[in-house]
Design a protein with these regions (language model features):
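Structural signature of hydrophobic alpha-helical transmembrane segments
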Residues: 4-17, 59-73
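Short cytoplasmic-facing helical segments at TM-TM junctions of multi-pass membrane proteins
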Residues: 144-181
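C-terminal ends of transmembrane helices
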Residues: 22-34, 76-87
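Non-cytoplasmic
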Residues: 187-212, 216
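Loop-to-helix entry region at the N-terminal start of transmembrane alpha-helices
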Residues: 6, 10-14, 65, 87-141
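Alpha-helical transmembrane segments of multipass membrane proteins
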Residues: 22-23, 51-53, 74-78, 104-112, ...
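Hydrophobic alpha-helical transmembrane segments of polytopic membrane proteins
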Residues: 212-241
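Loop-to-helix transition at the N-terminal end of transmembrane alpha-helices
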Residues: 31-53, 58-70
Length: 259
């Protein structure tokens, strides 16, 4: 197996790629120079911290620390997912439950089936991938659900006046929101290997792993991303649609935080 270690000097030279982005922003007057510098600086600091934390966790190889790190990943994913919602507030709890349950079930299946072992260097990276994908899916679900509720207030009110429960009145909206949230993951699965070489597969090949073995891991990743996204969006949607109704089963659009 061929190995290649990137040096600090080569990493510093690679920073020139960021300079290119800054120059383009300056020339085209995009006013993104500060944002680019801030995002790059923040990414460097975050990755350095995470790198040393993971190095410690991997060396200790403690189950409780591994679980704590998985929960930390799910916490951050839920926090960012609820921030992506443009139409209602206080969605963190539902986001955390949805992402944690979705990721937990997927990880349990992978571990029990023998696809991965319950060791930090396997569980934590996998948890990061599935939680990140679930975060995006849940955010899309929230936005679509909020848009649909606002645009279809009249139809919802009519269904409620005819005796429908909030769940019945929201059934089509929930279904369409879940579907819209899953489309990016499904489309990604359709084009994997044809349009792009995904992260895990590329990383393994770059590290010198046999491409056929790398493909097997990528197939596993495709399965787990679809599973987690499906579970997380369904849970998040069914926990969230109730925010649009009061205790009398009336639609309360004033609770939305439309921007």
């Amino acid at each position: 197996m061929n190995s290649h270690n990137i040096t600090n000097e080569s990493l510093a030279l690679a920073l020139m790629l960021v300079v290119v982005a800054i120059l383009i922003s300056h020339k085209e007057k995009l006013a993104l120079e500060k944002d680019i510098l801030w995002s790059v600086g923040r990414a460097i600091i975050q990755l350095i911290i995470v790198g040393y934390v993971l190095k410690y966790i991997f060396s200790v190889d403690d189950a409780s620390l591994t679980l704590l790190m998985v929960l930390f990943i799910c916490f951050n994913a839920a926090w960012n997912a609820q921030k992506r919602s443009k139409y209602f507030a206080k969605a963190f709890i539902s986001s955390f439950i949805a992402i944690t349950v979705g990721a937990g079930i997927t990880l349990a299946v992978l571990i029990l089936s023998g696809s991965i072992e319950f060791i930090p260097m396997q569980v934590i990276p996998i948890a990061g991938m599935i939680a990140g994908n679930a975060m995006v899916a849940v955010g899309l679900c929230y936005n679509n659900l909020g848009q649909r509720v606002i645009s279809e207030q009249q139809q919802i009110q009519e269904k409620l006046s005819l005796g429908a429960t909030p769940k019945q009145a929201s059934a089509i909206l929930i279904r369409d929101s879940i579907r819209a949230a899953l489309i990016p993951t499904v489309d990604s699965a359709k084009t994997v290997g044809l349009v792009s070489l995904p992260g895990m597969m590329s990383g393994l090949i770059f590290a010198g792993i046999d491409p056929v073995k790398a493909i097997k891991y990528q197939i596993m990743v495709t399965f787990m991303l679809l599973s987690t996204a499906s579970l997380s969006t369904i849970i998040a949607c069914y926990l969230t649609y109730r925010k649009f109704y009061n205790s009398r089963h009336q639609l309360v659009v004033t609770q939305l935080k439309k921007k």
